[in-house]
Structures are given as structure tokens and as C-alpha cells.
Amino acid sequence: MSYGALLQLGFLGLLTASIPLLWVWVKGDADKYRKLVWITTFVTFDLIIFGAFTRLTDSGLGCPDWPGCYGHSNPVTAGEMIRAAEAAMPSGPVTMVKAWIEMLHRYIAMGVGVLILTLMGLAWARRAELKRSPWPATVLFVLVCVQGAFGAWTVTLKLMPVIVTIHLLLGVLLLCMLGALAAQTNPLPIGANAVARLRGPVFFALAVVFGQIALGGWVSTNYAVLACQDFPLCNGALVPAMDFARGFDLTRPLGLNDDGSLLPVQALVAIHWVHRAFALIVVVVLGWLGLVMLAAASDSAYLRNTAWGLFALLGLQVATGVSNVVFAWPLAIAVAHNGGAAAMALLLALLNSRLAARQRDRPVAFAAGARA
């Protein structure tokens, strides 16, 4: 890729970031750090949803090189090569539409990188004024760089399932860390008794949700959503024939065994069935947590609203998960299922951060009159 194309690509990333940055700096709020943290969290959530859309539309190899598209910064100037690839393999992964989807995903990802770089710079420049350590923002910048590397390997290793799944998990981790940072800038009052009752259960629930997201990512990256054709049974059986060893082999390429032979259907069934079975554990854990939160809420509107939000997201996940099977994996429902999982992780990360801050007796725990 030429230096000129790299400069154009960098400019497009800056242009993507300039819209939220302009909004932060033009608004009259004096606490620009707080506003930047929240807008970066929002854009990162959007990036995760668009990443799911990219994966679900089979656009991950719409541009088979990285960081550009056939050595160009955009599909327009790479149009001749894209059309040639499509003509050579009409049912292949390269089309003009898929190339645009993939490159838009990369532009947004670069924009998030610029936002986090700006956030880190602001955290260090105003560390005395903010009275916060700049190291969390620095860790975020390191994480987004690692995430970018996995984004590159996703393409260069031809959608290898373990790489794509780690890429997804790092994205959710980045979102949750941004949420934790955002929670510290938006203090809400939580009683000491509620903290004592909820600190452990919330952290445990967050770990369970991360585990289920990992399993869901493994289903998606292996295209195992329709391996079970019915619900609540799986291909007419409560426990169908499954091949766990091959299904959960982390070293194999997409759709193949290590020896190059096709992955058996039983392996895909195992992947799907484990995700479905673990969903029962998630429902029990989050349902129990929601009830504990309501019992501990007392006069805390935040805890009550969070509990009901958790119930709503849990219902959304169950409904969209079942619908993916019953309605043969419609795109809109599949994207909503991915977005709901990310939203659930973010909700728990926000709550976990506020509970942790209260437990450490930071000012965030005692502040009243939280800002919207």
C-alpha cells in the first residue's frame, strides 16, 4: 500500500472522529473529558453493532487485504480490482457492497482509535485538574491498538474463528472499560447496604455474560446458528449427536479440521448446543440478580431502573436468540441479538464500576444529584 493511500486512509479515520470531537468541543459543557468519555463509549457500541453487521453479511473479506482495499484507501478507487474479483468468483466474498461495508467498519474503528488517543492525551494534560489517574485511559489506548491488530489478523488469517472471536471479545472488553471510566465521571448515590449485597453478584453476572458472549461469538464465527434446526429441541433431540473435540478446536481454520477436511455437522451442533445450554444459566443468574437488585434498591431509582433494564435486555436476548433459529437467522434479528449482548455487558460494567467506587469510599459513591 502506497504512502499516499495510507495518508488518505488516515485522513478518513480523522474525518470519522472529527464529528463526535466537534460535538464535544462545540457544546458548552466545561467538563469536556466527561463528555468525550461518554461519546467514545457510544461510538464504540455503534462499532460493535456495525462489526456484527459486517460479520453477518459475510463482508469480513470484502477487502481481502489490510488496512486498505486492494492497496487503496476506499472501494471507489479499488473498483476495477473489486469488479474483477467478483467476476472471477460471483459467489465469493468480494463485491462492491461488501467492500464498502468492510471499509466503513474500518473507518469507524479508526475513528474510535482517534477518540481514545484524544481521551488519553486529555487525561494526561489535565490530570491535576481532573484529579484522576490517566493510566486507565492509557490502558484503553493500548487495548484499542491490540484490537486493531486482531482486526488485521481477522482478514489476513481468512476469518479464522478463534481470531474473530477474540476480536469480538476485545471489542466488548473495550466497551466495558470505557463504560467503567464513564461511570466514574457520572456519580450516582448507592447505599452501603446495597453495595454489600450486590458487589459480588454483579461481578459474577458480568463474568457469566462474558462467557456467554464468547460462546455466542464462537457460534457466529463458525456459522453454527442453524446447526440446530428447531427449538426447544435440537434437530428433534434434547441431546443430539455432537462432536465437542472438533467443534471447540481453537487451532483450526474456518469450516475445516486441522487436516483440511470439512468440519462435520456434529461439530457445529456441539457449538450451537453449548451456547443454548449456557443460556439457561445466564437466564437464571441474571433473573436472580435483577430480583436481588430490586430488593436492595430501597430508595435508589438508579438500581431499580438498572434492574428493569436488565430484565428488558434479558427478554430481548431470549426472544432474538429463539427467533434466530425459528425464522432461519434473519439479519435484523441477528444484529439485534449481538447488540443486546453488548448492551447487557455495558449495563453490568457501569453498575460494577459504581459499586466498586462506593466500596473504595471514593467521592463518586457519595455524590448526590447525578448529572444526566
Question: Model regions: which residues?
Answer:
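Small-polar-interrupted transmembrane alpha-helices in polytopic inner-membrane proteins
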Residues: 43-50, 135-153, 204-212, 305-326
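Interfacial helix-loop-helix junctions of multi-pass membrane proteins
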Residues: 50-63, 142-168, 219-230, 318-342
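A juxtamembrane structural motif centered on a specific transmembrane helix
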Residues: 180-197, 201, 346-372
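Extracytosolic (periplasmic/ER-lumenal) interhelical loops and adjacent juxtamembrane/interface segments
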Residues: 56-102, 225-268
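Transmembrane alpha-helices
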Residues: 1-30
